[in-house]
Design a protein with these regions (language model features):
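Hinge/lid segment of periplasmic solute-binding proteins
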Residues: 102-153, 182, 209, 295-297
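Extracytoplasmic/periplasmic substrate-recognition and gating elements
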Residues: 65, 249-250, 288-350
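Conserved N-terminal structural module of periplasmic/extracytoplasmic solute-binding proteins
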Residues: 2-105, 303, 326, 342, ...
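Extracytoplasmic "Venus flytrap"/periplasmic binding protein-like
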Residues: 65-128, 144, 163-165, 267-268, ...
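Short, solvent-exposed loop/beta-turn-alpha elements that line the ligand-binding surface or hinge
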Residues: 118-128, 170-174, 196-201, 219-238, ...
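Glycine-centered hinge/linker elements that transmit conformational signals in sensory
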Residues: 185-187, 226-258
Length: 430
């Protein structure tokens, strides 16, 4: 469930970017008698000038200065490499003390991680936003600690909607139902908009697009008990709507949804060719850079009920290397409000703590203004079931096959049933 700035995070230059900070060496102790904490973190920057290395370097230096018995060594890797590198380190018996990566469930299932209550102070643990903390639990115990987050909203091109008569000039737009959304898309089509509504169900991020529509249709990938409900009646009806009312009516443009990736949909939006699509904070920056006027609102629901946004998070975890006290103290420091907000402000992400949430919400900084609509949706957002070891495989099934559900001859019930069957087999449930 990565919050990449493709999704939230963009990897650096695409190559390995390894930097050791505050010293070198791979041991957990030193000849000076100090404890050495080895941290592996992902790079959220787009290149050397805004690499996450700077944040971690300063954090490690300040922490080491205030805690002379502990030295923190941080290795910063590109998103292309960091998950695989940590997995390799664990396999070789050289796991880092702390890793900030995209997923934790496999390590938790293997008994490799400390639970949060053996690491964090009560104050820090209580400060984590509830839906994010809950997503870090496996069988009731929290092993994944949220690091940064984002939510997904519906974007619209203001000029295109005004020109099509969907909204008056200078007015805002918030459709409440799918019927209103469909009516707007029809007006956009009649006015010559190439893609009234983009529906990227291609292999890049089909699971995200699917989950957003499922939630809006009253369903979801899992229920409140975290059991898979992929082939529920609500979800089948959602994909029947997408197939019949959007794709079948010619409202999703010339690209087949199953072959359209989010990246290309975003590019088309920033080129002024798309009226409406689901997106994340990075699209705000991309659209503004090309002079696109936009609005951002929750995706309307099938019946006008209160919408629930989809959330995405990246994770931090502590491996059982014999230093729970030292690892926990460093994590307490990492989660201090000033550190949380410094990182999220730099990369246009959302804080995962209540204190950071309030600080961003109350901020007068114009740079944070576009993020506040995403921020307000975060506390009630629904996240992927990342605590399930099966999720990686289920996500892959969505990417491979869900686009076929909305093809002209698509059978949503059958496609979702096949994905659900794969999920149940992976879970070992009937």
């Amino acid at each position: 469930m990565r919050v990449r700035r493709r999704g939230l995070r963009m990897s650096g230059a695409g190559c390995l970017a390894m930097v050791l900070l505050a010293g070198c060496g791979m041991g957990s102790g030193s000849d000076k008698g100090e404890v050495v904490l080895r941290v592996v973190a992902a790079d959220y920057g787009e290149g050397p000038l805004d690499s996450s290395t700077t944040f971690w370097k300063h954090l490690a230096y300040r922490y080491g200065k205030a805690n002379p018995g502990v030295r923190v060594e941080v290795t910063v890797l590109s998103w292309n490499d960091v998950d695989a590198k940590v997995a390799e380190m664990v396999e070789k018996g050289r796991a880092p003390d702390i890793a900030q990566i995209g997923a934790y469930a496999d390590f938790a299932a293997a008994g490799k991680l400390y639970p949060a209550d053996e690491l964090l102070s009560v104050r820090t643990e209580a400060d984590l936003l509830a839906p994010l903390a809950d997503a870090g639990r496996v069988h009731g115990d929290q092993y994944g600690l949220p690091f940064v987050a984002s939510t997904r909203l519906m974007f619209y091109n203001t000029d295109l909607l005004e020109d099509a008569g969907v909204i008056a000039k200078g007015a805002a737009w918030q459709p409440r139902t799918w019927a209103e959304l469909t009516a707007a898309a029809k007006k956009l089509k009649e006015n010559g908009v190439r893609t009234p509504i983009a529906l990227p169900l291609g292999p890049e991020e089909a699971q995200a697009e699917s989950m957003q529509w499922m939630l809006a249709g009253g369903g979801g990938i899992t229920n409140d008990s975290e059991g898979y409900v992929i082939d529920s009646t609500a979800n089948v009806k959602t994909f029947e709507y997408l197939r019949d009312d959007l794709v079948g009516a010619g409202l999703t443009g010339p690209d087949e949804p199953g072959g359209l990736d989010r990246r290309r949909a975003f590019e088309a939006f920033t080129d002024g060719q798309v009226g409406i699509l689901n997106g994340h904070p990075t699209l705000v920056q991309q659209a503004h850079a090309k002079g696109i006027k936009l609005g951002m609102v929750p995706l309307p629901t099938t019946d006008g009920s209160e919408p629930r946004a989809m959330g995405v998070a990246d994770w931090i975890m502590a491996f059982k290397n014999g230093h729970p006290k030292e690892s926990g103290a460093f994590l307490d420091y990492l989660y201090e409000e000033k550190n949380v907000t410094a990182f999220t402000a730099k990369y246009g992400l959302l804080p995962v703590t209540t204190s950071g949430y309030r600080r961003m919400l109350d901020s007068d900084d114009p740079k944070t203004a576009p993020l506040k609509v995403f921020l307000r949706a975060l506390p009630s957002s629904r996240l992927y079931p990342v605590g399930k070891k099966s999720w990686a495989g289920v996500s892959a099934e969505f990417k491979k096959s869900v686009g076929g559900a909305v093809a002209p001859d698509g059978r949503p019930a059958d496609v979702l049933a096949d994905i659900a069957e794969s999920a149940r087999k992976a879970e070992g449930t009937p």
